[in-house]
A protein has these predicted regions:
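Residues forming well-ordered secondary-structure scaffolds
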Residues: 26-29, 60, 163, 167, ...
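Flexible loop/turn segments at secondary-structure boundaries
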Residues: 50-51, 73-75, 101-104, 134, ...
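Residue-level detector of conserved catalytic or cofactor/ligand-binding positions
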Residues: 207-214
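Charge-rich interaction surfaces and accessory domains that mediate macromolecular binding and assembly
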Residues: 119-186, 192, 197-200
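Catalytic pocket of metal/acid-base enzymes, prominently hydrolases
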Residues: 1-13, 17, 21-28, 123-144, ...
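Histidine/acidic residue-rich metal-binding segments in metalloenzymes
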Residues: 4-12, 17-98, 102-118
Length: 214
């Protein structure tokens, strides 16, 4: 059973292990800078990543892809498109470009905006977040994305987090440089945490007595 778990764990995730194994060395190194240092993503790199990601997903049975995002509804949303592109002679080819990987355009009027924009400004964009690994689920390649309005306002729960992490990195780098540390990027990790402390009942009751005293 344990061996089976190890075989299937992460088997449908386009993680760094898969990237390093399948991407050309130069492409992987460039993408690695984006992942770990926040470097801008070159469109040529995105084209190569998209092609490799499509082949990997198709090997796992995927026929469609979706930009997967978290709008202000409290649940995830998806906009599905197919890899299949019909051609003039009645056949079809499988396509997936860097542009399609990097950006999508769902109808933002279907989602809450907190009054950030007029109802006529319905256009919204999904933008690939390469720091969250793509994965295959139910024969669909799911690409984690941020969701913003056409003027750049956050329409989801991920964009404020990514912007906060970037701001924290910039300020942490300033502090570290004061201490002589030359770094390019500071990674932050967040997650729910709950701690419980066990103390003796008599100590708890004693603390209540002290608190109640004037």
């Amino acid at each position: 059973m344990a061996a089976n778990v190890m075989e299937i764990y992460g088997s449908k995730v386009f993680n760094e292990h898969v990237m390093k194994e399948r991407l050309p060395s130069a492409t992987y190194k460039s993408l690695e800078k984006t992942l770990h240092k926040g470097a801008p993503l070159d469109i040529e790199v995105a084209n190569v990543v998209a092609s490799v990601m499509k082949r990997w997903a198709m090997e796992l049975g995927a026929t469609h892809y979706t930009h997967w995002f978290q709008p202000l509804t409290g649940i995830t949303s998806e906009k599905h498109d197919g890899f299949v592109s019909p051609v003039g002679d009645g056949t079809a080819i499988m396509e997936f470009s860097g542009k399609e990987l990097v950006r999508g355009e769902p109808d933002a009027s279907s989602f809450p905006s907190g009054g950030l924009r007029a109802t006529c400004e319905a256009r919204g964009y999904t933008a690939w977040d390469p720091t969250s690994f793509a994965f295959v689920k139910d024969d669909v390649l799911c690409i984690p994305t941020a969701f913003v309005s056409y003027t750049g306002e956050a329409l989801d729960k991920k964009t404020p987090l990514l912007r906060s992490m970037n701001a924290l990195s910039n300020q942490a780098i300033r502090v570290l440089k004061l201490f002589g540390k030359d770094v390019d990027y500071v990674s932050t990790t967040v997650g729910p945490e709950q701690e419980y402390f066990l103390i003796k009942k008599e100590d708890y009751e004693l603390s209540l007595i002290h608190i109640s005293e004037p």
